[in-house]
Amino acid sequence: MMKTELENIGFTTVESIYSEREIEEILKILNEKEISGQFGVREFLFKNPEIRSKIFNKRLKEIVKQISPKCTNSIKSIYFDKPPNSNWTVNWHQDLTINLSNRKEVDQYKNWRETKERTVVQPNRELLENIFTIRIHLDKCTKQNGALRVIEESHLKGTIDTTEWIKTKVGKETICEVGKGGILIMKPLLLHSSRRTETVSYTHLTLPTTPYV
């Protein structure tokens, strides 16, 4: 069911992956390292390896194995916190890039970009179709506090020109509400956006994951 939903409509949600105690332990580490006050931290797991065992608990490992038994690698990890007094709107887009440790010319890889910390590239469609992203919710995520909005089945259409698509907004829009400790799993080619947080702080960790990188 879960894997079928992910493949067919582009996303699925699973509740209660983390217990209250596990969330408290994660938040304790975030507070001790003064991460909780930051709006976003890229390469989160690389910079904070001690939290990896808390994130990849038994239940999450089982979920990943069900989706892709060969999956062994997380290629990105981003921590986000959107408090009501300082948050932002994310316009409709697809996640088209991955991070690499260094540049190596590969057929159909394009839009290379070098930063101090990483090499960013847009891979071919085949690889993007085999990646799935896990959004871990440390707070309850509702329509009022920035829940992700997605266009069902849009991941099946490859790379989409969003400037043209926005004129018609063809497709079924769904708001992905997730409980505290739950996860949203999605395909990176799925069109998605989020609005400003209206109520309490909204905290989540994003893990694009693939068996191929």
Residue map of PLM features:
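Conserved small/polar residues in nucleotide/adenosyl-binding loops
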Residues: 203-209
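Non-heme Fe(II) oxygenase catalytic core, chiefly the N-lobe of the double-stranded beta-helix
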Residues: 3-9, 18-180, 193-201
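Short catalytic-loop micro-motif centered on adjacent basic/acidic residues
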Residues: 13-15
